[in-house]
């Protein structure tokens, strides 16, 4: 076990219920990240693969049909990872000291072995969470909780009919409410739920922000702001690019960010994102690939439903699980070169990890610190 993982395991029981202490630890970690990033800009050979998180796309299948998503349609249709393949990946991740396993899709809860996969994470002592649309949580959560699941992140793409319009299915928002109510009523705060809110053109309004805040209050779900993508291979621009922002949308984006900052000042526990990161959002959305901030995806491994293994969502392919084990793809020359190319932005330069990239790069952080 590496030093970082050992310290986290020792300190977690202390900071779990002490938000202030947790924020202090995050501040220290941010300072260390900035030192490493600064040194690596001067000496690129310092960049090495350091995978901490692994994202497993368990299946391309989904029970919704979101406007911006291509999963299961023309992106990896009819693909899913087998239980045996997932077990081997998790064993290799444990051996390589990965810290967090994200289970997602598609919709991971429609994978027939989702409970066994969570059980395997628990058996190996890997911290796992599921990213879900929440539509079938009520049917699955009891077995998942028994298997050891304690963390969920739930995608929210609007409130009420705005949500139904985006997912292109009737009455799904009311189903989402019913499922979240069941989880909260049955398990209270024994299960952590994060609200993954997507900031795109249809949700970029003060009314939507305020409605989303009330929704987060209702279910005790801290908000993380995801930004609409322009370079992910499984994400579309919508119909006539109706999801994407243009330069003339900057005032509306800034108004939304300012409203989040106002609400955060009143209830910081509902938006545990740095104000510095929030202030950077308009530039991330408007500048797109011209937002030149070193990438930290050398800390990630992404696995597609067809077995593809990459260092990030978009590019830097390392191999395929149908051909070799994960352990044989890690820390190779290909992996090292990918880490250095990503850091140097020799890639499509998406905004994945915009929060850690902003806070982990001293000049960028300084730019958005505010007065």
Language model feature labels by segment:
Residues 1, 5-12, 143-310, 314-320:
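Radical SAM enzyme [4Fe-4S]-AdoMet core and its adjacent flexible, acidic
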Residues 58, 62-63, 82, 176, ...:
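Generic structural signal for small/hydrophobic residues in well-ordered secondary structure
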Residues 61, 108, 135, 159, ...:
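Residue-level marker for beta-strand->alpha-helix junctions and adjacent short loops that shape enzyme
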Residues 52-56, 278-283, 330-341:
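Short, intrinsically disordered, charge-biased short linear motifs at domain edges
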